[in-house]
Amino acid sequence: MPISYAVVGASRGIGLEYVRQLATHPDAVVFAIVRNKKGSFHLAAAVANLKNVHVFEADVVDHASMERAAKEVAAISGGKLDVLILNAGRMSGEAVWKGFKDYPNMDALDADCIDAFKINALGVVHGITAFLPLLRAGPTKKIAVLGTDGAIPNTVYALGLPDLSAYSMSKAAAMLATAKWALQLKDEGFTVVTLAPGLVDTTDTVGTSGDPTVKKILQDIDKNHPAFVLETPEQSVKVQLKIVDSLKPADNGGHFRSHPGNQA
């Protein structure tokens, strides 16, 4: 029996790899949601001529566009969806690594944090809200939100990570929003979880493969923080999918890790 997946944030990086791997499953129907369909070159190349992948355009910041995308998915899926994977996030190259001290002024810090919150935190709320009618109509009722151990206070402190300020704070809010949804939906048989992929080198598809600063940051983390192991998207998503496929209602509200190094 076909299993339907919607991957929000599928144009590059981890989301793109989700689509690639899911598309190889003969019983999977994949709905890839991207902010800019014309600009999703890596996705277009990956899914060319694949009949089980459908691409739709929506921005998680714009709840109306997410609702339109959900209706477009429903028109193909018969109004149902089995699994929602929320990967959309704000990862803007070197800027994402900034700590409080790295901003020129408070206005710049405020703007960065607000923008990150809209995408990373409110985007989760918008995504789940839009696809909830389809998930309710389906038998599986799984929601996986991509989180990060970098949003867990004791991990941040133990590893000595004062940077990633806007990203980490907004992802912490996203993980809390996921917990709220897990509570709200538990009596309906849903399984709503956060999933931390660990340290994944996505530079080949996010436009930063030639940025020496980003490469150095990844190498430094890999070297100085042995709790994290730098993985490829293929390695990470392979494990993530095993976790997603094994989820059951008893796992509702959980935080799972796909990477070798658990929290410090």
What does each of the following model-derived ranges do?
Residues 23-41:
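Conserved glycine-rich Rossmann-like NAD(P)H-binding loop of the short-chain dehydrogenase/reductase
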Residues 61-78:
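Conserved Rossmann-fold cofactor-binding substructure of NAD(P)-dependent oxidoreductases
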Residues 194, 211-264:
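C-terminal helical subdomain
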Residues 85, 144, 192-195, 205:
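Hydrophobic structural elements of the Rossmann-like NAD(P)H-binding subdomain
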Residues 47-64:
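Rossmann-fold cofactor-recognition segment
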Residues 90-125, 136-187, 199-202, 209-211:
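Catalytic loop of short-chain dehydrogenase/reductase
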